[in-house]
C-alpha cells in the first residue's frame, strides 16, 4: 500500500505509473467532474494501447459545466455514466489479473492544491469497490450516450 498528501502528483500521473507497472488494463474511474486537460491525458493513454477500456462515472451537476466536452468524452471513454457522485475512485485491472485500487481526493481535473491518495493491491478491496462501481453504473446512473442521443436528435 502507498499513500501521500501532496501537490506534486496528479491522478493522471498515478494512472500512467500504475499502467506502466501492470500493463494493458481495463480502468474504472469515478469523479465529480472532468477537465479537458485530464481528458487529453486519457486520450494519449488510450492511444498508447495501455488500456483495453475506460469506464467513467461523473456527477450530473458537474457535467453542466463540461457540456462542450461531451463529444470528446464519447470518443475517448468506452462508457460514461452520470449520477449523483462525489466519489473519486480509480480501479485498474490488468489483462494479467493485477488489481489496483486508488482512492483519491482529486477530481479528474488539474489543480495545484494538496490532494491525497491511497493505492492498494488488496484484491478484496478491489473486488468490493468494483462491485459498488458497477452497481452505480448499472442501477443508479444514466449513460452519457443516451443523453447525447436525446440532445442531438
Question: What does each of the following model-derived ranges do?
Answer:
Residues 1-153:
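PLD/PLD-like phosphodiesterase catalytic module centered on the HKD motif
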Amino acid at each position: 500500500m502507498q499513500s501521500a498528501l501532496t501537490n506534486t502528483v496528479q491522478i493522471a500521473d498515478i494512472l500512467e505509473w500504475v499502467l506502466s507497472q501492470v500493463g494493458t488494463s481495463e480502468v474504472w474511474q469515478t469523479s465529480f467532474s472532468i477537465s479537458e486537460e485530464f481528458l487529453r491525458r486519457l486520450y494519449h493513454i488510450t492511444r498508447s494501447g495501455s488500456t483495453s477500456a475506460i469506464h467513467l462515472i461523473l456527477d450530473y451537476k458537474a457535467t453542466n459545466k463540461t457540456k462542450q466536452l461531451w463529444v470528446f468524452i464519447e470518443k475517448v471513454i468506452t462508457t460514461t455514466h452520470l449520477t449523483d457522485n462525489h466519489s473519486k475512485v480509480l480501479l485498474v485491472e490488468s489483462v494479467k489479473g493485477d488489481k489496483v485500487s486508488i482512492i483519491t481526493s482529486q477530481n479528474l481535473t488539474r489543480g495545484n492544491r494538496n490532494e491525497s491518495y491511497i493505492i492498494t493491491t488488496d484484491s478484496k478491496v478491489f473486488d468490493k469497490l468494483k462491485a459498488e462501481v458497477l452497481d452505480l453504473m448499472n442501477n443508479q446512473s444514466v449513460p452519457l450516450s443516451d443523453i447525447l442521443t436525446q440532445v442531438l436528435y
